[in-house]
Amino acid sequence: MISVATAECFTHGKIGTKIHKIACGYKEFEKDSNYDMIHGNVYVMASMFLPSKKGIESLLDVNLPKPDYVFKYSKAYNQENDILVAKLVAKALKNKLNCNIAISSTAGIGNGAVCIVTDYNDYVFSSDIYGDLLKGQNIIKRQESGIEKAYNTFIDILKKEYNLK
């Protein structure tokens, strides 16, 4: 079984929740074209929504850079630092839980960043939607784009790296 863990911010834990529901056989996902590939082959060790720097650092024993922007209790970075933070979080999660696949997401101002670290490779990409957390601009559309791209990349990884069909 392939173990998966997520530490998500702008995707609100929805990547891990979707994978978990399919892996566990939730009926609402039986029509997903990848249901048979995930169900019985994948399990989710943890799926976390972690919007705060303190929460991430405390749970994953990682030091993150100072946020670029002040936003309530949450961290907010520019695009360049979102990419850096996504990498740091995914690698820390993989090391902490010793899972096969670790997925992280973060987004402040920009397209956000998703990082998937596997036993073999690191993948870093952004959503297709620019958003601004401080202004509340396009954050739902950015989230939806990030979730879709992360799930599709996860499926590609299962096929290419873990030979699932």
Curated annotation (Swiss-Prot):
Entries under InterPro entries matching the protein: HcgF
Pfam families, A to Z: HcgF
Domain of life: Archaea
Cysteines paired by S-S bonds: none
Family in the record: Belongs to the UPF0254 family.
HAMAP family assigned to the protein according to its UniProt record, in alphabetical order: UPF0254 (MF_00673)
Name of the featured protein: UPF0254 protein MMP0935
